[in-house]
Amino acid sequence: MLVGKQFDSVFRNVVGSTRDSQEEYDILLFNGDSVFIIEVKYRVHPKDIDTLIKRKGGNFLLLLPQYRDFQRHLGLATFSIEDAVLQEALDRGITILQRRGDLIETIPAAA
């Protein structure tokens, strides 16, 4: 459960492409009206936030137009993230999934 929603389907390494562009999405979670785009990084850097928002998120509808009516959410799954980078991601609407021992902590984006 993320952003208060249950996701029913999980797909890994999904490739969307057109003649001019191609993108691989690490994890896509789906339910009937929402898609959660999750990029997986060992350690998150500030440029990863821009890549997720501008390139991966920005190209999503172009590459996978069948989901144009779905509400889109962005997330970063990581082992390590500095506090300043974490706050930037949250402020920009990205949910963080961070491993803490055997558990995954979910840090929701700022409302």
What are these regions (language model features)?
Residues D20, R55-N59, A77-F79:
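Short amphipathic alpha-helical surface micro-motifs
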Residues K5-G32:
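Active-site metal-binding core of divalent-cation-utilizing nuclease and nuclease-like domains
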Residues G16-S17, V44, I81, L103:
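Residue-level detector of flexible, active-site-proximal loop/helix-junction positions
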Residues R72-A111:
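Domain-level recognition of nuclease-like catalytic cores that cleave nucleotide substrates
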Residues Y25-D48, L52-F60:
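Conserved catalytic cores of phosphodiester-cleaving nucleases, focusing on short active-site segments
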